[in-house]
A protein has these predicted regions:
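N-terminal activation segment of mature serine protease catalytic domains
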Residues: 28-87, 91-92, 103-104, 128, ...
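Active-site region of chymotrypsin-like
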Residues: 43, 135-145, 174-227, 232-235, ...
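Conserved active-site neighborhood of the chymotrypsin/trypsin-like protease fold
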Residues: 49, 74-77, 86-174, 197, ...
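Gly/Ser-enriched beta-turn/beta-hairpin loop segments
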Residues: 55-59, 122-127, 182-197, 248-251, ...
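PDZ domains, with a preference for the canonical peptide-binding region formed by the helix
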Residues: 98, 235-236, 304-343, 468-497
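C-terminal, low-ordered peptide segments at domain boundaries
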Residues: 140-150, 313-314, 320, 341-422, ...
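PDZ/PDZ-like domain segments forming the peptide/carboxylate-binding groove
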Residues: 201-211, 261-311, 400-475
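C-terminal subregion of chymotrypsin/trypsin-like serine protease catalytic domains
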Residues: 214-254, 500-531
Length: 531
């Protein structure tokens, strides 16, 4: 005879039901696709960048497709009225990579097949964000701005289930699900910016500018997706960008002012009088912008930022995301303009410095990082093409430029400070951190020599770093034209940094003007200078 143990049977059925219902309990509600289908704004950009090897020409046009999100600028009583943006009107938000160097931006609504032309209102290339406007009022009919919500970390209920859109065809859309891997600090190499970024798995068919959804709320914007993973900008950064866009004078996002490392060896700790067992990070370079640029020195040992102690690997305990790199403080806890205390060891003494949270700036470097929306700067004299060393120029060596570009040029970028050319140049560079970008010294090159009878014998010269012209030190491109106005003899003399193919060259003063005109006509160069 079979005997039933009713408590056991009841317990068993309870466990089975719980097991069957568990996926439904844990899985977040899938967002409805219809509202997004009606509100969707598709973006197509036609982009044509400059050819930095032949700076008066442009490269072939390429196209990209993605999305743009309808937004309204947040209203703040403390912000001044902006000249370029209006808080009461709607704008489109997308990535800067989608619109950089665009000759045409074509925007389409799913319910209106007619394309509209968009224009860039504001672009922050370092943060990879851009704001667009469309003048035709018909485009904005029935469109509503997105209501943003902060993204939740994985430990919170249903927080791991996130969604974005997948466009299979013009009429066939679906929602694609994924999971938050972590909130990381990403390095945007083209601008050397360290910013918060969400790393996702499972989402691979979305694109730039697509919304990121969690618990049926919009919590971010997709940066890139593919091969089963994606990256997204969280809401907090997007709202900060929009808030800055609505201010009287735009500032980029909050950023640190230094590069850092662990103490490389015990002798370094001894030299800088740092207790090696004390948690913290070693400041090995101070940038001319960002939080702490006014108070920090190279060699400082930073132990605490505000109320957050630093570990040896530069991590803090974030209240939402746990152990993270300290840059994550700028996501939601530290905003531009906030007062901030920095605790550190300097020359063996523990000190506290007061500063304010400051924003990223683009041009505070000897070698400017990638620039978009601006034509290359150049000067042509006697066929010698003078340009400033930039990341755009180095990128002309292709995707592997970090190993293919000339080593002596790459060193300037990797250190982002000049090789010691002479004592006078060193002094100028040391002062540049506290000066505006117009006075910052640059590395000026003769990138190539355009053939003409005046420069026979010099035509193989390339990538030569200019020290002086006619005895005048060259620290920026505009110095070149000024120096050519003041020859010391009947010849112009150009001196180069040792290591170039030549240490110096000469060009006759007589005939230089005629040579410039021949070169302009023969090579169809629109103008001989651009800066």
């Amino acid at each position: 005879m079979i005997k039933f143990n009713f408590p056991s049977v009841i317990l068993g059925w309870t466990l089975i039901c719980a097991f069957l219902l568990l996926p439904q309990v844990l899985k977040a509600e899938v967002p409805a696709i219809k509202p997004w289908f009606k509100q969707a704004v598709l973006l197509k950009s036609y982009q044509q960048s400059y050819d930095w090897l032949t700076p008066w020409e442009k490269r072939e046009i390429r196209t990209q497709t993605g999305m743009a999100l309808v937004v309204r600028l947040p209203v703040s009583e403390n912000t001044e009225s902006a000249e370029t943006v209006d808080k009461q009107v709607l704008y489109l938000l997308t990535t800067a990579e989608m619109v950089a160097d665009a000759t045409l931006l074509e925007v389409t609504r799913k319910d209106i097949r007619q394309p509209f032309q968009a224009k860039i209102v504001l672009m922050d290339y370092a943060a990879n964000l851009a704001l667009l406007n469309i003048e035709d009022s018909n485009f904005w009919d029935s469109l509503n701005p997105i209501d943003w919500s902060p993204v939740k970390s994985k430990p919170k209920a249903d927080a791991g289930n996130i969604y974005s859109l997948n466009i299979k065809s013009v009429q066939e859309w679906e929602v694609q699900s994924g999971t938050i891997q972590l909130m990381a600090v990403g390095h945007r190499r083209v601008s050397d910016a360290w910013l918060a970024v969400l790393k996702l798995s499972g989402i691979s068919k979305s694109g730039q500018g697509f919304p990121l959804l969690q618990d049926n709320e919009t919590v971010g914007m997709i940066l890139e997706a593919g091969k089963g993973e994606a990256k997204a900008i969280p809401t907090q950064m997007l709202l900060e960008f929009l808030a800055h866009a609505g201010s009287g004078s735009y500032k980029s996002l909050a950023h640190r002012c230094f590069s850092w490392s662990r103490l490389p060896q015990r002798s370094t700790a001894d030299f800088f009088q740092i207790p090696p067992e004390l948690p913290g990070i070693w400041v090995n370079r101070v940038l001319p912008y960002g939080t702490g640029s006014d108070v920090l020195h190279r060699g400082d040992y930073l132990t605490k930022i505000g109320e957050w102690p630093l570990s040896h690997d530069g991590k803090i305990k974030h209240p939402e995301w746990g152990r993270s790199l300290f840059d994550l403080l700028f996501l939601d806890l530290l905003k531009v303009g906030d007062s901030l205390d920095l605790e550190l060891i300097r020359e063996g003494k523990a000190i506290v410095l007061q500063t304010r949270v400051s924003a990223y700036e683009e041009d505070g470097r000897t070698v400017p990082l990638k620039r978009v929306g601006h034509p290359p700067r150049y000067v042509i004299q006697g066929g010698f093409l003078f340009q400033e060393l930039t990341l755009n120029y180095l990128s002309m060596w292709g995707a592997n430029w970090r190993s293919r570009a000339p080593v002596r040029l790459r060193l300037f970028l990797e250190q982002n400070k000049t090789v010691l050319m002479d004592d006078n140049y060193k002094n100028v560079q040391g002062e540049s951190a506290s000066q505006n970008t117009e006075s910052a010294p640059r590395v000026v090159l003769v990138t190539q020599v355009i053939p003409d009878e005046i420069n026979i014998g010099y035509q193989k010269l390339s990538n030569a770093i200019v020290l002086r012209i006619n005895g005048q030190r060259i620290r920026r491109l505009k110095d070149v034209d000024e120096a050519f106005l003041n020859p010391e003899t009947e010849f112009h003399r150009i001196d180069f940094l040792p290591g170039s193919d030549r240490l110096s060259v000469i060009l006759p003063v007589a005939g230089l003007k005629q040579s410039n005109q021949r070169i302009k006509n023969n090579f169809r160069i629109p103008k001989l200078q651009s800066y």
